[in-house]
């Protein structure tokens, strides 16, 4: 007998999905987000404590309900349950900035959520009657207004089952799709002949998912890692080991690789709904991204129409491409970005940026709010990027100058707001006087308290302005508003992984920063909501460093997948006479590096790229190279290139060329990672320098943090991030088994064991030479090809 499908859903998602209506209006929703408005739960907890000993706070509730052809498993958390003499009351707490006099009745979705909790609790406890209490609290005055309604169990059951019945048609549609999907997964074979080692890699991924573990994969170019990770993950979904995979990337170009892999599998017969989430600013139909019904016609009535748009796409089994989503949004007159988010709930695979999962201010609440776990598989591509991205996502700063600017803007507009800004500014001024360069601070809690008051005043001001018809506010005000909100959210996360400090920057600006040095704990908060995680990259070296900063588990798996490309196709040279140390920099060294470059490109006509540690260093060497560049075509990366300019730059790398062309680029920039110049489009890479970041306060904080914990602080702060840039830059050449090319490392430090210890295994054969030997070495290599 076939086991009935179990569909898991949070109570919040159920009511918001079925009962949503009206307009998109970020002037309301953007400022009335529950977590932000309750300032990390401070006021929430205060109200709960005031309710006495008969009040149970944060009660988890679950219900598995038999439906037509499936089981619905609902999960949620009631803010409180109050036992009052013979009455049972479900309490739902919401924060508001408006005057409580204007809150005349509960918001329908809020009430529906509480009624669901009431039904579940009454059903489980065998209650004939139960009350629902909506508690609204003004964040400025902390005044409270309550609405209480009593229901019989029969009333709640009738209402609840009707709600579930409205959901059933969606569930049935999904179940039918999953049957088709799983049947196709079972018959879909690996789309290529397995390369050497590729089957073992795919098997490692499947085993990891089966055991619900994490896996770190160092997979050099040529191992076919994308398909070796994606295919077993899809297979695992077909075996019920997961119900949705998230393919997470740091850059747009990597998303394209994932899309191509899905397309290849679909050509082999796979039925699998995959969707790529495009940033709101890119997919928006309007010139300005203003999400409210006054500025955007697609926002007006969006929620009245969007479910029909989603159901139509799913029922007709339309492909969830950006183009089809934009067409559907036009046809149904809805926001394309919000439509894509709704469709992602019904997709089997979601390709998106890291921040949709990990960023506390931008993650997809429909999947990751309320701490409700799901059978998710996380595939994290180019995972070496997640350390710095994690630090950025879980850190926050406030600048004194921004506070002062907004204070001046508000001077004649709102006295209470100005007073709050003045209070924050005064405290920052005191802290600034104690700071010469940067200063570690034991606690910024007094500052956070003042920011809480400021946020409340800003919320109140925005609400009053909106009610008066003044929706538009100065950019500086709104930017500070979001910065304050983020700072307070991050403040709630503070633990031993953080350093709090103040800094007087070189330009005179003063900031207070909450710096997440080790993001592993915060990342794990989201990863544990899924079943399994695969971290993979061509430059995940040393793996122990990444395991330390990306995971909190001690028993994670790790695999090193070596490239099986012929060793003879690659020539690795280390320039013994070059150095990028600050003490060695100057005209003489720039000339020497220019000589190395010239000798390299003279070895064979074709396309080369030289990667430099900074734009300034690149320009200094370029000035010398131009004196000896006769017959060499130059193409140069500039700062702040547009998408079109980047494409034009890459188009210069044609396969056929009867003279040398040399690109001047910067390590860590857009051309040092993710670009795929195969065959003769690129035959050589010169990496100038070790990639070590410049010494700065934040790097020193990282160094000292790990030194104090008995770990190699210099390596964590400087060496490992620098060598990652080197490996990424060098990885631009030799992308397929037929490619042939050279890698020249220009810095005498590459001869040191400290650096060679971080070379991938494929680099075990290299030669050290001076610039006068380079041309001969090049010619010898190319003659043997």
Locations of regions flagged by a protein language model:
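Signature of the SF2 helicase/ATPase Hel1-core->accessory helical subdomain module
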Residues: 229, 256, 332-349, 353-459, ...
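Conserved RecA-like P-loop NTPase helicase motor core
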Residues: 576-588, 638-751
């Amino acid at each position: 007998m076939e086991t009935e499908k179990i569909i898991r859903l949070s109570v919040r998602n159920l009511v918001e999905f079925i009962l949503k209506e009206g307009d998109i209006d970020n002037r309301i929703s953007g400022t009335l987000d529950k977590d932000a408005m309750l300032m990390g739960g401070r006021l929430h907890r205060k109200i709960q404590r005031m309710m006495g000993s008969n009040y149970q706070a944060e009660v988890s509730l679950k219900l598995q309900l038999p439906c037509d052809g499936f089981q619905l498993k609902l999960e949620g958390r009631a803010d409180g349950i109050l036992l009052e003499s013979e009455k049972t009351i479900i309490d739902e707490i919401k924060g508001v900035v408006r005057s409580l006099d204007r809150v005349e009745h509960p918001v329908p979705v809020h009430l529906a959520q509480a009624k669901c909790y009431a039904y579940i609790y009454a059903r489980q406890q065998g209650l004939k009657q139960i009350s629902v209490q909506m508690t609204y609290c003004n964040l400025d005055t902390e005044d409270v207004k309550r609405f209480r309604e009593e229901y019989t169990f029969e009333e709640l059951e009738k209402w609840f089952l009707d709600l579930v019945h409205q959901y059933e048609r969606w569930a049935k549609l999904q179940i039918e799709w999953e049957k088709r999907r799983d049947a196709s997964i079972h018959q879909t074979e690996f789309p290529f002949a397995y390369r050497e080692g590729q089957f073992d890699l795919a098997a490692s991924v499947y085993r990891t998912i089966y055991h619900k573990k994490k896996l770190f994969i160092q997979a050099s170019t040529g191992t076919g890692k994308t398909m070796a990770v994606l295919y077993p993950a899809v297979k695992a979904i077909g075996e019920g080991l997961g119900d949705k995979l998230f393919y997470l990337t740091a850059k747009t170009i990597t998303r394209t690789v994932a899309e191509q892999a899905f397309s290849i599998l679909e050509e082999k017969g796979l039925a699998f709904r995959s969707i790529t989430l495009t940033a709101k600013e890119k997919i928006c139909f309007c010139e300005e991204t203003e999400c409210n019904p006054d500025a955007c016609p697609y926002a007006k009535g969006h929620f009245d129409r969007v479910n029909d748009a989603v159901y139509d796409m799913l029922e007709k089994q339309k492909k969830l491409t950006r183009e089809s989503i934009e067409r559907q949004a036009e046809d149904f007159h809805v926001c394309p970005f919000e439509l894509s988010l709704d469709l992602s709930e019904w997709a089997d695979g979601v390709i998106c940026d890291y921040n949709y999962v990990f960023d506390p201010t931008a993650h997809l609440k429909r999947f990751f709010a309320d701490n409700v776990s799901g059978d998710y598989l996380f595939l994290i591509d180019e995972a070496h990027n997640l350390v710095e991205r994690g630090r950025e996502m879980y850190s926050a700063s406030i600048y004194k100058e921004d506070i002062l600017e907004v204070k001046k803007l508000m001077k004649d507009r709102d006295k209470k707001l100005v007073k709050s800004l003045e209070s924050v500014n005064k405290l920052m001024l005191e802290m600034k006087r104690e700071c010469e360069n940067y200063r570690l601070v034991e606690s910024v809690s007094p500052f956070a308290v003042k920011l809480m008051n400021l946020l409340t005043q800003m919320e109140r001001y925005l609400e009053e302005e909106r009610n008066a018809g003044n929706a538009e506010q100065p950019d500086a005000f709104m930017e500070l508003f979001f910065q304050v909100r983020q700072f307070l959210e991050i403040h709630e996360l503070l633990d031993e992984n953080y350093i709090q400090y103040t800094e007087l920057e070189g330009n005179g600006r003063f900031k207070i920063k909450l710096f997440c040095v080790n993001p592993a704990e915060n990342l794990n908060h989201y990863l544990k909501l899924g079943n399994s995680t695969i971290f993979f990259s061509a430059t995940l070296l040393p793996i122990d460093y990444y395991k330390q900063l990306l995971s909190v588990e001690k028993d994670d798996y790790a695999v090193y997948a070596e490239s099986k490309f012929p060793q003879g196709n690659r020539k690795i040279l280390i320039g013994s006479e070059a150095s990028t140390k600050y003490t060695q920099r100057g005209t003489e060294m720039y000339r020497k590096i220019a000589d190395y470059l010239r000798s390299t490109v003279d070895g064979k006509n074709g396309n080369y790229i030289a990667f430099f540690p900074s734009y300034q260093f690149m320009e200094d060497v370029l000035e010398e190279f131009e004196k000896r560049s006769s017959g060499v075509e130059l193409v140069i990366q500039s700062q702040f290139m547009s998408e079109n300019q980047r494409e034009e730059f890459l188009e210069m790398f044609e396969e056929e060329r009867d003279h040398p062309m040399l690109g001047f680029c910067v390590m860590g920039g857009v051309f040092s990672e993710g670009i795929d110049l195969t065959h003769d489009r690129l035959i050589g890479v010169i990496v100038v320098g070790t990639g070590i970041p410049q010494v700065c306060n934040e790097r020193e904080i990282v160094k000292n943090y790990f030194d104090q914990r008995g770990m190699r602080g210099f390596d964590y702060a400087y060496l490992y991030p620098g060598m990652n840039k080197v490996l990424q830059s060098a990885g631009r050449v030799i992308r397929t088994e037929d490619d042939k090319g050279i890698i020249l490392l220009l810095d005498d430090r590459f001869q040191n064991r400290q650096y060679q210890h971080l070379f991938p295994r494929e680099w075990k054969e290299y030669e050290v030479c001076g610039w006068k030997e380079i041309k001969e070495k090049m010619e010898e290599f190319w003659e043997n090809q």
